[in-house]
Amino acid sequence: MQTNLLKPKIISVEALTANQAKVVMEPFERGYGHTLGNALRRVLLSSMVGYAPTEVAIAGVVHEYSTLDGVQEDVVNLLLNLKGIVFKLQSRDEVTINLRKEGPGVVTAKDIDLPHDVEIMNPDHVIAHLSAGGKLDMQIKVEKGRGYVPGNVRQYNDETTKIIGRIVLDASFSPVSRVSYAVESARVEQRTDLDRLVMTIETNGVLSPEEAIRQAASILVDQLVVFAALESSEVSGDLAPSRSSMVDPMLMRPVDDLELTVRSANCLKAENIYYIGDLIQRTENELLKTPNLGRKSLNEIKDVLAARGLSLGMKLESWPPANLEK
């Protein structure tokens, strides 16, 4: 009797639009289509890293319930329009940008002054309508984050963020707009009780649908690998866990598992960084001192770690484990 579970052998990606794609995976054992489809959908909607405006300061505005002379929209609608802008930061985690325009005319996202490493994916997005004599002058802070973070739960310790007139926004960082999945019947040879998983993914352009599902799958693997590493221990007089058993198994995986570019991987190995646990303890400044490792490689490393819920500069008390091989 067949005891091994089938794994999908056919994975196809069909682009429906520039930011929408249909991903088909088959065959799965009966029931696994719903199991994996629902898990992937939840991760895609909640755990992808993206960018969003988080704070706004508008000249002449003290709070969000104000109005501006010569501006058709009130401040509440201005803020809603700002949250509809799709930003993409290339080499930083946050940036403050300026928007200044005088009427009459329409204010769109392309009127924002941007540094060279910041991109707006929907430049024609309308922000406001100005009449003759109307003027709009604002500063917008854009940050990198994950999921949805309401403004009232964000914590600020910097006094500069508490000045009057600075408005904190609810931030929706997720680059994934919509995800749906369907499970169809599949057949392999004489077996007709199998599943085919069909997922339709739409993003805002910051991330391609194919890259989104790849990152979601990687997040699931990294979360579940902890359970795969569970070991049964015999009862003994010493019940204290060993030093190596306290370390997340994911941190003991080689940096090759991060699938970095050859250049980045070679730079890390030259610095004796062989495991993910070695890497996350390094700071950005330390890595930038590595020969041949520039800002582009650093950003690649940060993005790959962020997709796994990790970051540079982390502290590990139980590293390295005693049984770790170099």
UniProtKB/Swiss-Prot annotation:
CDD domains linked to this entry = RNAP_alpha_NTD (cd06928)
| Chain intervals for the UniProt region annotation (Alpha N-terminal domain (alpha-NTD)) | 1-231
Q: What EC number(s) does the entry state? A: 2.7.7.6
Gene Ontology molecular function terms on file: DNA binding; DNA-directed RNA polymerase activity; protein dimerization activity
Q: Which residues form a coiled coil?
A: none
Q: Which GO terms describe its cellular component?
A: cytoplasm; DNA-directed RNA polymerase complex
Outline the segment boundaries, as ranges, of region: Alpha C-terminal domain (alpha-CTD).
247-326
A GO biological process held by the record: DNA-templated transcription
Keyword line: DNA-directed RNA polymerase, Nucleotidyltransferase, Transcription, Transferase
Pfam assignment, any one? RNA_pol_L
Q: Which reaction does it catalyse?
A: RNA(n) + a ribonucleoside 5'-triphosphate = RNA(n+1) + diphosphate
Q: Which Gene3D superfamilies does this entry report, sorted A to Z?
A: 5' to 3' exonuclease, C-terminal subdomain, DNA-directed RNA polymerase, insert domain, RNA polymerase, RBP11-like subunit
Task: Extract the HAMAP family matched here.
Answer: RNApol_bact_RpoA (MF_00059)
| Family membership | Belongs to the RNA polymerase alpha chain family.
Instruction: Note what the entry says on domains.
Output: The N-terminal domain is essential for RNAP assembly and basal transcription, whereas the C-terminal domain is involved in interaction with transcriptional regulators and with upstream promoter elements.
Its annotated function is as follows: DNA-dependent RNA polymerase catalyzes the transcription of DNA into RNA using the four ribonucleoside triphosphates as substrates.
Subunit-structure text = Homodimer. The RNAP catalytic core consists of 2 alpha, 1 beta, 1 beta' and 1 omega subunit. When a sigma factor is associated with the core the holoenzyme is formed, which can initiate transcription.
Q: What is this protein called?
A: DNA-directed RNA polymerase subunit alpha
Q: Which organism is it from?
A: Polynucleobacter asymbioticus (strain DSM 18221 / CIP 109841 / QLW-P1DMWA-1) (Polynucleobacter necessarius subsp. asymbioticus)
Q: Give the lineage.
A: Bacteria, Pseudomonadati, Pseudomonadota, Betaproteobacteria, Burkholderiales
